[in-house]
Amino acid sequence: MSKWISLLKMKSKTFLDSLPSNFRNEKSFFIQNNLTDFEKLSNLSDLDINEIQRKSSLCTLNNLKKIRAIAIFKKEIGISPPQAYLLLHCGISSIKSLSLSTPYELERKVGRLEWILRVKNETGTTFSLLKEWIKKASQIDKSIWNLG
């Protein structure tokens, strides 16, 4: 029974709920302005982000751009917010930079970050998953270039 309850809780969790607490000001702004869907957040332009920062001085430019990047990773590749946040901490901030990475390089960066933070891999990122993400990112990157 408790397994079903935890599954229901997971389903009801929104994109914003899965973001770390250091985004609390941005989360508050998004909730107040009904911007809770990762699809909408992934489509924010730089102009939109600057406007949000102008309206709410507690929202930082850096955090707003990180949230947009996390939303893009989720929308385009299906990467969970915690996994996307891990990629950001490893220096991967876009589909393009992910497509140019190798699984070995990413595995090394993730391992180094975990060692520095003295944590185990809680996001479930495996070598094969890293390969899959890079493959998807490369396909997206190629399709963008083919449109132009």
Locate each region found by the language model:
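C-terminal extensions
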Residues: M1-G148
